Curated annotation (Swiss-Prot):
Region (Disordered): 100-121
Keywords of the record: Ribonucleoprotein, Ribosomal protein
Signal peptide coordinates: none
Domain of life per record: Bacteria
GO cellular component, one term: cytoplasm
Source species taxonomy: Bacteria, Bacillati, Cyanobacteriota, Cyanophyceae, Synechococcales
Natural source organism: Prochlorococcus marinus (strain MIT 9312)
Keyword Ribonucleoprotein: yes
Molecular-function GO terms, alphabetical: structural constituent of ribosome
Entry protein name: Small ribosomal subunit protein bS16
UniProt-listed InterPro entries: Ribosomal_bS16, Ribosomal_bS16_CS, Ribosomal_bS16_dom_sf
Length: 121
């Protein structure tokens, strides 16, 4: 499978990245199939070879999360609503439990009201 990912280069603690197409089993700084762009996180500079990127995407290349974000900012991919990774499963589970408790309390209160109305009749 072909992946679109970042290849690190530059000085120590002053990293820059090249956006490359490479085999998914190859090393991070291994020889890429094709260089498709450049990204400098310090200056936020991004250069994309749009034609080559479109060709690779139509061939079925899968971008990594960071490259996907760069392509979305560059307008090559549509922005998709993705659930935040920061929200843990435990937090989601707590929210579900809290919602279920609220529903149960509402159901109990409505049953109590209907029971009292029937008793009065």
């Amino acid at each position: 499978m072909i992946k679109l990912r970042l290849k690190r280069f530059g000085k120590k603690k002053e990293a820059s990245f090249r956006i490359v197409a490479c085999n998914s089993t190859s090393r991070r700084d291994g020889r890429p199939l094709q260089e498709l762009g450049f990204y400098n996180p310090r200056t936020k500079e991004t250069r994309l070879n749009t034609e080559a990127l479109r060709i690779r995407l139509t061939q079925g290349a899968q971008p990594t999360d960071v490259v996907r974000n760069l392509l979305e900012k560059g307008g090559l991919l549509e922005k998709k609503e993705r659930p935040s990774i920061a929200i843990g499963k435990a937090k989601l589970e707590k929210e579900k439990v809290a919602k279920a408790k609220i529903k149960n309390e509402e159901n109990d209160s409505s049953k109590a009201e209907s029971d009292s109305n029937e008793a009065e009749s």
